[in-house]
């Protein structure tokens, strides 16, 4: 026989609500600390015992509550933060539903002590399992103290899902860290089992980061500040080498509220995509400010997820703000001490270690032509000759480079200011910056220059192409042929010129000019693979970036490549004029720095 529909008792509905709001001790801490911040406090003390299962106590010096308000606060959906439905779209507080206190009280032994500013005494309320047992006057400082004991004592099924004391305590510490980063003007203290985990005094955001994440992280952060299209993005972003294996150090806030939002995270990762290797995540503390009516925070019980009215605009502004800082590579510092002249500046021939004069001349001849000749026609599956080293379009020599010596000196960029010592293994350029030794990966540097050049050309309409003297036929799969037909426009903008020869056979008539002299058919197939992934989880912009990265990588020297003085100067001039110049498009570093102290330590001189 079917059961009749009935109204659930209030004690049961509170437990159901608690299941949505109170997932673990950290959830309780979040709700109570947010209430303290909404109360306008200047200091918050968070104390836990047994990972929060035995005790959670939150003390603040905020505005406090009267006896009547304190009792009303334990009723469901009782709040001072909203009054009409319009208020839901103009929220200026962290809490607004009026569910937290009754939900927490329903699954714990709960004590609320509060004293309103200007009152001569406070009020203390004790509740057990959601039922108020005692209300009395008390003496206390202005503010509020909430104590939660024996969490989930009346819901044993929930206790089974609790993790170890250490794990639950770690979640609480992480939660308090996120909240403390959002309000550097508020003092925070976090105590676990009588031990102070951290104490953060009021100060600047950088001070707060140093106190919570460490001075090493703080020293690697650089400011972000951009306001456009109704969105303002401020905060701090770390240089690429200070990265993590997980997204745990992405601290993002919308109108002061900590969020984990896929749109925001994607925008940040897009800005870093050519700085970090796959599987690495940056350290950022970002604050996004938009009109309250442009964001809906009433999406999830924990309020960690939000919905933007114009998410595309928000995404692009965040990405642009982070890229603006990364583009300037502010972490490159010039030594303040004068650059000492190298002991012996090698002549151009001396950069080539173990290479005879005849080989030097051959290399110079190869470098005379800025664009290599296109490889002669060969069938796709014909026997291949022994592989030759990949060649880059040579950097112009000292007599014909794009930026002459005057321009290099006039630019005054970081790379051009370095004193070149020589080459190591025909792959790394050794330089001196004051007393520091700077080692530059010439392949990574040239790859970044080529990549940024390709991006500029693509943004202007089309990557510079080059027609083949002997067009080449290529057999593609049916799927690859479909991709060519569907994305012919994108392929054309990327510098490829393909003509349908019938069936799945295509004629390659032109290629990106930077690919001349390389295995461009292999790259063509890789490009088609990238374009095949569109529509599932990738946009055309994502695919194009990856394709241009591949083109840049294939177009530059991979093996040992001796450089003359003029070529090094030209490369450095290009690097000074190139955005994001400290990392190659794959995220690998272009340069490493060793201080004199580090070198002396290697030799046990200090």
From Swiss-Prot:
Q: State the residue spans of region: Disordered.
A: 377-401
- UniProt GO cellular component terms: mismatch repair complex
Instruction: Indicate yes or no for the key word Transport.
Output: no
MF terms in GO? ATP binding; ATP hydrolysis activity; ATP-dependent DNA damage sensor activity; mismatched DNA binding
Superkingdom of origin: Bacteria
Coiled coil ranges (UniProt) are none
Q: Does the keyword Zinc-finger apply?
A: no
Annotated GO biological process: mismatch repair
Name the keywords, alphabetized.
DNA damage, DNA repair
Matching entries from NCBIfam families are given as: mutl (TIGR00585)
* Family, similarity comment: Belongs to the DNA mismatch repair MutL/HexB family.
Describe the function of this protein.
This protein is involved in the repair of mismatches in DNA. It is required for dam-dependent methyl-directed DNA mismatch repair. May act as a 'molecular matchmaker', a protein that promotes the formation of a stable complex between two or more DNA-binding proteins in an ATP-dependent manner without itself being part of a final effector complex.
The identity of this protein, by name, is: DNA mismatch repair protein MutL
């Amino acid at each position: 026989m079917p059961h009749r529909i009935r109204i659930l008792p209030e004690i049961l509905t509170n437990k159901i609500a608690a299941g949505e709001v109170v997932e673990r001790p950290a959830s309780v801490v979040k709700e109570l600390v947010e209430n303290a911040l909404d109360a306008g406090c200047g200091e918050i003390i968070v104390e836990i015992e047994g990972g929060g299962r035995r005790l959670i106590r939150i003390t603040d010096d905020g505005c406090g509550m009267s006896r009547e308000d304190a009792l009303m606060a334990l009723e469901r959906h009782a709040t001072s933060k909203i009054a009409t439905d319009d208020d839901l779209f103009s929220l200026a507080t962290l809490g607004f539903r009026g569910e937290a206190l009754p939900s927490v009280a329903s699954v714990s032994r709960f004590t609320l002590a509060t004293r309103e500013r200007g009152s001569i005494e406070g009020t203390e309320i004790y509740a057990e399992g959601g039922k108020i047992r005692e209300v009395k006057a008390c003496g206390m400082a202005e503010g509020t103290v909430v104590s939660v004991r024996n969490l989930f004592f009346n819901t044993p099924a929930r206790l089974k899902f609790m993790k170890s004391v250490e794990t639950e305590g770690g979640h609480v510490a992480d939660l308090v860290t996120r909240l403390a980063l959002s309000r550097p003007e508020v003092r925070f203290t976090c105590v676990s089992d009588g031990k102070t985990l951290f104490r953060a005094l009021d100060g600047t955001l950088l001070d707060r980061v140093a106190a919570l994440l460490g001075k090493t992280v703080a020293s690697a952060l650089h400011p972000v500040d951009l306001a456009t299209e109704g969105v303002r993005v401020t905060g701090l972003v770390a240089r690429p080498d200070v990265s993590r294996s997980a997204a745990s150090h992405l601290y993002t806030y919308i109108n002061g509220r900590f969020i984990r939002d896929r749109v925001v995270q994607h925008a940040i990762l897009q800005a870093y995509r050519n700085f970090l290797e796959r599987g690495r995540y940056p350290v950022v503390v970002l604050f996004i400010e938009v009109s309250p009516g442009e964001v809906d925070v009433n999406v999830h019980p924990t309020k960690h997820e939000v919905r933007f009215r114009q998410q595309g605009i928000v995404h692009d502004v965040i990405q642009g703000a982070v890229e603006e800082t990364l583009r300037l590579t502010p972490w490159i510092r010039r030594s303040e001490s004068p650059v000492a002249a190298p002991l012996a500046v090698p002549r151009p021939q001396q950069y080539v270690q173990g290479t005879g004069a005849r080989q030097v001349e051959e290399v110079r001849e190869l470098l005379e032509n800025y664009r290599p000749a296109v490889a002669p026609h060969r069938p796709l599956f014909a026997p291949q000759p022994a592989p030759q080293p990949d060649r880059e379009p040579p950097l112009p020599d000292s007599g014909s480079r794009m930026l002459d010596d005057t321009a290099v000196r006039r630019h005054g960029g970081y790379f051009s200011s370095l004193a070149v010592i020589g080459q190591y293994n025909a792959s790394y350029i050794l330089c001196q910056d004051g007393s520091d030794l700077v080692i530059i990966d010439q392949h990574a540097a040239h790859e970044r220059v080529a990549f940024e050049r390709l991006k500029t050309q693509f943004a202007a309409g089309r990557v510079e192409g080059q027609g083949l003297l002997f067009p080449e036929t290529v057999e593609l799969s049916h799927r690859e042929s479909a991709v060519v037909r569907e994305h012919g426009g994108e392929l054309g903008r990327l510098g490829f010129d393909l003509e349908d020869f019938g069936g799945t056979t295509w004629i390659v008539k032109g290629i990106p000019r930077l690919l001349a002299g390389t295995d461009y058919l292999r790259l063509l197939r890789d490009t088609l693979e990238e374009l095949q992934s569109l529509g599932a989880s990738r946009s055309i912009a994502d695919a194009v970036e990856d394709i241009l990265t591949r083109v840049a990588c294939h177009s530059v020297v991979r093996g040992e490549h001796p450089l003359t003085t003029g070529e090094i100067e030209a490369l450095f001039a290009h690097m000074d004029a190139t955005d994001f110049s400290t990392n190659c498009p794959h995220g690998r570093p272009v340069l490493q720095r060793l201080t004199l102290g580090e070198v002396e330590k290697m030799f046990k001189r200090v």
